[in-house]
Amino acid sequence: MKTMISPSLLSANFIDLKSDIEMINKSEADWLHLDVMDGVFVPNISFGFPVLEAVSKVCTKPLDVHFMIQHPENYIEQTAKLGAMMMNVHYEACTHLHRTIQQIHAAGMKAGVTLNPSTPVCVLEDIICDVDMVLLMS
């Protein structure tokens, strides 16, 4: 198993976002991790598709989009149109996780599943063979 380096856009300087993305483009990072938060599933709000679209135009690294939102399945096609390589959804946010994973794959992306700290890993038993990545929140 290879260790992947995926810096988060949330650590960037939002006043000079393009410079930080260009720095990541020149780095040895494997991916760029984008945390999308809606203020409902999680208490914070980060950014949405206008920012994702702008980032996708200047970033040369594969995009790993992590949705910390309710109903992430509503944004699969829009995320694929950005050219995202990976779409990460929370187990706790998906009513039909297996269907969501299949839809992500059908849209041409890899599918990641994220677990909140209080969620036992055993909940992934039925779908673990279908996911490309598991992200454990801390």
Q: What is the predicted function of each stretch?
A:
Residues 114-138:
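Histidine/lysine/aspartate-rich catalytic loop segments that bind and position anionic ligands
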